[in-house]
Each structure stands twice: as C-alpha cells, then as structure tokens.
Amino acid sequence: MSKEFIRKTKESKPVVAICYDFDKTLSPDDMQAQGYIQSVGDEVESFWKESNGLAEENDMDQNLAYMFTMIQKAHGKVIFNKKALMDYGAKVQLFPGVETWFKRIRDYGMERGVIVEHYIISSGLKEMIEGTKVANEFEKIYASSFYYDKDGVAQWPAQVINYTSKTQFLFRIEKGTLDVNDSGVNDYFKPEDIRIPFRNMVYIGDSDTDIPCMKLINSYSGHSIGVYNPKTKDKRKVYKMMEDKRIKYYTPADYTEGSELDKLVKTIIDTTASNEKLMAVHYINKQEQVSHNGQIDNKEDKEKEKLSMDLEISHRFKHTHTIISELKKIKNSN
C-alpha cells in the first residue's frame, strides 16, 4: 500500500520559514564532538582526519564517510542505536538564547499577523538533533540519519544530506510537501498558490556548506544570515561569504532577546508583513488582467519549474551553481 502524504496548504496569513544549519549555527561545535567521539576513545581531530581521509581515498561523500566511521568506531565499545544517539544529542550545547528563541520569534510573528515556522536543514545527525532540548520546536528536521535493524542497531545510512542536496528541502518547504519521499514537490504551483515563497524564507548558517541554500534564497529576494561564534568573535567566514555575495547579513550567534540577530529577524518579519499585503494586491491585479486577456502566458513559470526540478536532483556544486544562475535570470526578467 502506498503511503498517503500529509501536505501543508497555503495559509490565510503570510508564512515565514526560518531554516537553520545546526552545527556552529545553533551549537558552538560539531555534535559528534560533544560526547560520541570521546566515548569511543578517540580524539576529535584524529576522528575527522580519518573520516575525511576515507572519503578522499574512496571518492566517497564526506557525510557518508563520517557515518561509516561512527559505526566502525562504535564496534565493541558503545551501543550504537537510536536511543544512544539521542542521549548524545541531549548533551549538545546550544548558543545563548537558543532554548527560548523559537517560541519568542513565533509569538512576535503572530503579533504582526505572520506565521513563523522553524526548520532544520543539516548534514549532522537527525537522531542527535532529536535528542536536544529544542527538537520539538521544528516543523521538520532534515538531517542525515541511519537505518536500524530489528534489534535497533544502526546498520546503514537511511538519509544523507550534503551541501548541494540541502537545496531540495527548500523546495519542499516552499510547496508544503515536507515528506522526503513525496513526489508532489515536482508538481507545478501558480506563484500565488505557493505556500512559502522564497522571498519569505530566512536561512541562517555559518559556513561553506550553507552556500547553495543561501545563494538560492538570495536569488529570489529571500534573506540569508551568516552567524559566527560570539565568544571567539572570528568573523573570517562571514566576511568571505559577504564578499562573495552569499549572505545579506551577519551577526553573532546570540539568540537572546534584544541581540543583533533577534532584532534582525524581527525586522524581516515586519518587512514580510508589509510586503505580503502588496503582493496580495499584485496577484489580484494579475488575475484580473489574465481574465481580461483570456489566457495565461506561463512560459517563464514552466521554465522555472523545470530548473527547480533539475536543482532538486543536483549533487554537484558546479551544476547547482549553474542552475541557480539560470533561475536568477528568470527572476530578473520579470
């Protein structure tokens, strides 16, 4: 029997989707380095050196390599099941203000007539993220995960997410087709029927792995924010991302009320509330014009849809970059 997918439909109010990387965006360090690596008697630096070496020597995806290395290192040392991974996740530290951030921003949105939804798009482990204190704050967690045998022991990757495949989840969020196996993400939607337009998306990340998502969101007038550790104040990565036009803004990863990030995101929500009123008028005018002319010229919409589908299955950065550039041309021609 085929699975019946639950899809989110367009709301009567505008929706803002805030999408987050996890490691070094919501947490100061890689999640694997906050308990798991130490439990198998390894050093953090040597673990990543071995994992990345495995990937390089075998033309292997780096994320598949770290997942394989985790399974191998656990043999005979620790139980490697979902509960154990969630327990490691419970130990993961979060940046200041993260625990109260999600509700606070949702509440602010409601005061402005805007629905705010939070999403994770991470190459880290879903099971560990599900073990954190904030797991229930997200509409959906898109992250790498394991397949478990009948005894509950991790055997094989069930899902792996790398820096280029991250972009497909933005399209799922855009259309409300959140299940990873829902082919409805390829369906055509009229612009006025899109649940969360890219212009109403915010992507918060810290490094190169976030660039494809940031670039895609930027190309459709969305909002990309680079964050850096507020303790070290090392801004080299955000400076580089700003120079390369990957981000529009950067702030410390301080999620407390009144922080730079707090004020910035609230300003984006305020802007969205005003802009969507204008867009509603635009769509009404457009529908009237189409009705008067008796036909719809949706050539550009169809071309955008084709490029979007190509982007969803792209696994190479160069190909992803080319597709996003073509999408941007369509946007700029409107």
Enumerate the predicted regions with their spans.
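Short linear interaction motifs
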Residues: 1-2, 196
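Alpha-helical substrate-recognition element adjacent to the catalytic core
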Residues: 2-150, 241
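Generic structural signal for hydrophobic core residues of well-folded globular domains
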Residues: 40, 272, 327-331
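Helix N-terminus capping/helix-initiation residues
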Residues: 43, 81, 132, 197, ...
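C-terminal cap/substrate-recognition subdomain and adjoining C-terminal extension
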Residues: 96-119, 123-321
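Extended alpha-helical scaffolding segments
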Residues: 316-334
